[in-house]
Design a protein with these regions (language model features):
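Extended ligand-binding regions for polar small-molecule ligands
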Residues: 26, 67-76, 142, 157, ...
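Extracytoplasmic small-molecule ligand-binding "clamshell" domains
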Residues: 26-106, 258
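Ligand-binding clefts/hinges and TM-proximal coupling segments of bilobed small-molecule sensing domains
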Residues: 26-30, 158-175, 211-215, 244-267
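Short loop->beta-strand "edge-of-pocket" segments that line small-molecule binding or catalytic clefts
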Residues: 39-45, 63, 142-156, 171
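Alpha-to-beta junction loops
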Residues: 41-42, 78-80, 96-105, 148-150, ...
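Ligand-binding cleft/hinge of the Venus flytrap
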Residues: 53-59, 70-79, 159-176, 204-208, ...
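Acidic, polar ligand-binding/catalytic clefts
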Residues: 67, 71, 75, 80-145, ...
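Periplasmic-binding protein-like
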Residues: 124-132, 197, 201-244, 262-267
């Protein structure tokens, strides 16, 4: 073997070794490695989200599609599950502070949020709806964007920036926890609750005075996905595979139908 060939072989081996080392280092830095090593999956949820991740006020237990599916994810991983409470206005900071490994609470995958966090493929899709009180001054979608009308939505939700751009005459009221838009609507501090399919379903099921208004055309149709810190491709690949599997094996459909979310399951 000539010296030139020997040097070429040594260089190739060095590159191969470096690539293997880098891959090993990336694996050790992944949440997937940390989760399997610790035996614990930490999932961020917003416990006020009906049919998604609600803490039932009567039982104190968590329920909803993402409670069911987070249990399935932990089962697939072979680890225990711990919930970390967050909100739409704080979940990005909570993820970046490593308070949880993953957000599973119907997070709208918007372009702006994607600048700060990573999203999986979607599992639900919803547009914007309006919930009002029967017999009130708001009787149709056309009545909403008028002077003197207060439109409420959760602070930090994807609906907030959309409605700020959409409404030209009505007032936007972004409601911060622990207050809820539902309570603001019931107390007449807002006239309209701008919300999504799960929350509108809850209101109609829970209150006989509740009425849902749909826009003339679908509005701000948004994919809902699971969310994590950027830069962890190994963990993102794993959770994407989980989402793909639950679509194929029927677990997503079953969990959605159980929680009355069948109409908004993502294809």
């Amino acid at each position: 073997m000539t010296m030139k060939k020997l040097l070429t072989l040594v260089a190739a081996l060095a590159v191969t070794s470096l690539t293997a080392y880098q891959a090993s280092a990336e694996q050790l830095q992944s949440h997937l490695y940390d989760i399997t090593k610790s035996g614990m999956l930490k999932v961020c949820i917003w416990p006020q989200y009906y049919a998604i991740s609600l803490r039932n006020p009567d039982t104190g237990k968590l329920e909803g599609i993402d409670i069911d599916l987070s249990e399935q994810l932990a089962k697939d991983l072979g680890v225990k599950l711990e919930y970390v409470e967050t909100s739409f206005s704080t979940f990005i900071a909570d993820l970046q502070a490593s308070k949880c490994d993953l957000g599973m609470f119907g997070v709208g995958a918007t372009m702006k949020r994607a600048q700060a966090v990573a999203f999986t493929q979607p599992y639900l899709i919803s547009g914007v709806y309006a919930v009002v009180q029967k017999g009130g001054k708001i009787k149709s979608w056309a009545d909403i964007d008028k002077p003197g009308v207060n439109v409420g939505m959760p602070l930090g939700s994807y609906i907030e920036p959309f409605m700020r751009g959409y409404l030209k005459n009505a007032k936007v009221v972004a409601v911060a926890p622990p207050a809820t838009v539902q309570a603001e609507l019931m107390s007449h501090r807002v006239d309209v609750m701008a919300t999504d399919f799960p929350a509108s379903t809850k209101m109609n099921a829970q209150f006989d005075w509740s009425m849902t208004l749909s826009p003339p055309e679908p509005m701000s149709v948004t994919p809902y996905a699971y969310v994590m810190n950027q830069g962890d491709q190994i963990w993102l690949n794993y959770v994407n595979l989980f989402v793909q599997n639950i679509k194929l094996d029927g677990r997503l459909k079953a969990a959605a139908e159980k929680n009355k979310l069948g109409p908004i399951v993502a294809p």
